[in-house]
Amino acid sequence: MFLPSTTNHSSAPLQKHLCLFCTFWALLFGSHGDNSVQEDFAESMLLFFADAEGYFAACTTDTTMNSSLSEPLYVPVKFHDLPSEKPESTNIDTEKTPKKSRVRFSNIMEIRQLPSSHALEAKLSRMSYPVKEQESILKTVGKLTATQVAKISFFFCFVWFLANLSYQEALSDTQVAIVNILSSTSGLFTLILAAVFPSNSGDRFTLSKLLAVILSIGGVVLVNLSGSEKSAGRNTIGSIWSLAGAMLYAVYIVMIKRKVDREDKLDIPMFFGFVGLFNLLLLWPGFFLLHYTGFEDFEFPNKVVLMCIIINGLIGTVLSEFLWLWGCFLTSSLIGTLALSLTIPLSIIADMCMQKVQFSWLFFAGAIPVFFSFFIVTLLCHYNNWDPVMVGIRRIFAFICRKHRIQRVPEDSEQCESLISMHSVSQEDGAS
């Protein structure tokens, strides 16, 4: 980085050179002109360069430049383009040829450094530190502040609360199997919303992703049919609550990924901390509203219920939501949504291992598509929205609609005609 020096020099050497310069031009014009012209020219030149000297002196003593730049460092220059020493045979020839005048440069260069606050990009591009330190600086620069995280949490706390409320209300009104089946449609809502409001290139809608989501929903249906118990208390309101919860979960994950594009920009524990704080401050009047309207009686829980609430809140809400949101940022919103459907066959497998519960073949027929669809979507997102189903359909369509080539049929001997050669015709004409 070559910058001019900003140190204050005395003006005497500059004035001396200016006087010599003006005298030279005066003598030059003196041989062809009048002495008055010489004196006027010398005075005008002195005034011009005096003003220029004052201008450059003001620029070099600029306080802003001195405050932003570091102290000058003088380093000797190494000219790499100098010709190497030639052999003795060539020296004899060069002595005979006259030497040409060369432009000479200073052997010392002045280097000054900008502070990191003024040139962060330049510092990052020229860093010689380990990669970890560079990543930490990038994360610090691009991280959202506490105020920005609080604004995002304030918007999403209501969506998060309504999604959990819908799911719990569906469990209280409908069978668990119906709730799980309808909640698995969250993957379909996520696929559609992510295509309408994409956060990155991995949210593009493809036919392969749609078939994978349908495969996951079909697997969840078979799994729940294998362990469902027939009961007459099916309620349509519970199904509506399940669909509402699935849609709200899709809105929640798609919109938060659109607001925050990278996982290192958002402090996830701070985000959920603000969500819990806003729910505590804004939604506590709902206890008295539900109590006095008669929808639900408000009573303080006993020790067992309170312990279950605390454990469920720490593991089932805080830890699971944290890991789930982090995984959605690292992969995609669709992968995170389909991962929730894996809890159904995994919980049934845990019952089989711990409580020795027996299930029919429908469970195994439904668990395989659920796992298979999850890995299919993972591969499709990994390979840059690869759509093998659409590629296969296009190839089949091109094969069916291709133009048939006209093949030549072997001709019969009766359809062949021997043409008279020109040589025989010329001989007959000569004989005649």
UniProtKB/Swiss-Prot annotation:
Residue ranges crossing the lipid bilayer per the database entry: 152-172, 177-197, 205-225, 236-256, 270-290, 304-324, 329-349, 361-381
The UniProt record lists the keyword Transport: yes
UniProt xrefs under SUPFAM superfamilies: Multidrug resistance efflux transporter EmrE
Record domain EamA: where: 161-225
UniProtKB keywords: Membrane, Phosphoprotein, Signal, Transmembrane, Transmembrane helix, Transport
Annotated localization: Membrane
Lineage: superkingdom: Eukaryota
Signal peptide: 1-33
Family statement drawn from the similarity comment of this UniProt entry: Belongs to the SLC35F solute transporter family.
PANTHER family in alphabetical order: SOLUTE CARRIER FAMILY 35 MEMBER F5, SOLUTE CARRIER FAMILY 35, MEMBER F5
Protein name: Solute carrier family 35 member F5
Organism from which the protein derives: Macaca fascicularis
Gene: SLC35F5
